[in-house]
Structure formats: structure tokens, C-alpha cells
Amino acid sequence: MPSVIFGLLALALGLLGVTAWWWSVTEFLRGAVPVALLILGLVALASGVQSVRLPRSNKGTASDPDIDG
């Protein structure tokens, strides 16, 4: 129950802060969104390069039945 009360209080104060300092929020978002997109793009590029580099062999996977027991 305390977490619900804390959550509602945080939502109310957050909405109050966003409405009171709207232009500051938009300035922050205008600076933060491009930086976040750059970071997400680098992560996506790195994971794509890593998946291309990994060999695609099915030897030794757990899905293959073991004939020798």
C-alpha cells in the first residue's frame, strides 16, 4: 500500500512540475532525444555487427539428439 501512495504522490508532483516548467522540459527533451538516438543507434549497430560475425553452425547445440548416450 505505501508503494501505491508513493506512486500517486510522485505522479502528482511530476505532473505539477511538468506543467509549471514546461519550457524547461521541452529544452531538456530537445537536447536529450538526439543523444539518446545516437546511443541507441550505436547499440543497434554493434549488435548487428556482432550477429553477422558469429558463426552459424549447429554443432554442439542442445537441440541435437545425442546418439552416443
Swiss-Prot record:
Its main location: membrane. It comes from the Bacteria. The chain crosses the membrane at residues 3-23, 32-52. Keywords: Biomineralization, Iron, Magnetosome, Membrane, Metal-binding, Transmembrane, Transmembrane helix. The keyword Membrane applies. Induction: Part of the probable 18 gene mamAB operon. GO terms for molecular function: metal ion binding. The keyword Zinc-finger does not apply. A short loop (residues 21-31, which is probably in the magnetosome lumen) when inserted into a Salmonella flagellin protein (FliC) binds magnetite, which may be used to purify particular forms of magnetite. Residues 1-2, 53-69 are cytoplasmic. It is found in: Magnetosome membrane. It is a multi-pass membrane protein. Residues 24-31 are lumenal. One of its GO terms (cellular component) is magnetosome membrane. Coiled coil: none annotated. Disruption phenotype: Cells have no magnetic response and no magnetosome membranes. Deletion of genes mamH to mamV (amb0961 to amb0978) gives cells with no magnetosomes and no magnetic response. This bacteria makes up to 20 cubo-octahedral magnetosomes of about 45 nm in diameter which contain membrane-bound crystals of magnetite (Fe(3)O(4)). Essential for magnetosome formation. May bind magnetite. May be involved in an early stage of magnetosome nucleation. Belongs to the magnetosome MamI protein family. NCBIfam families: MamI. This is Magnetosome protein MamI. It comes from Paramagnetospirillum magneticum (strain ATCC 700264 / AMB-1).
